[in-house]
Regions:
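NAD(P)+-binding Rossmann beta1-loop-alpha1 motif at the extreme N-terminus of oxidoreductases
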Residues: 1-44, 48
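Rossmann-like NAD(P)-binding element
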Residues: 57-74
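Generic structural signal for beta-strand residues in well-ordered domains
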Residues: 20, 52, 64-66
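N-terminal glycine-rich dinucleotide-binding loop that anchors FAD/FMN and/or NAD(P) in oxidoreductases
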Residues: 44-61
Length: 74
């Protein structure tokens, strides 16, 4: 499985992470503060055309915890 790390869990990073998880990638997000806590507690939610879908996602503020990655998006 392809391992992908995305720095930033805002609108763009979150959208990309959601799409990549749905495609079967092993995605991790680097986030801070309230975003990090929300991802850890509730997962990643995408709301599109009135429909919401929540997926579990790995999230950390310490990239070293993730180990080697195939791709890093920053």
């Amino acid at each position: 499985m392809t391992k992908i790390c995305i720095f930033g869990a805002g609108a763009i990073g979150g959208y990309m992470a959601h799409a990549l998880i749905k495609a079967g990638a092993d995605v991790s997000l680097i986030a801070r503060g309230p975003h990090l806590e929300g991802l850890r507690d509730k997962g990643l939610t995408l709301i599109k055309e009135g429909s919401a879908e929540t997926l579990p996602v790995k999230a950390t503020d310490t990239p070293e915890e993730l180990g080697p990655q195939d791709y890093v998006i920053s």
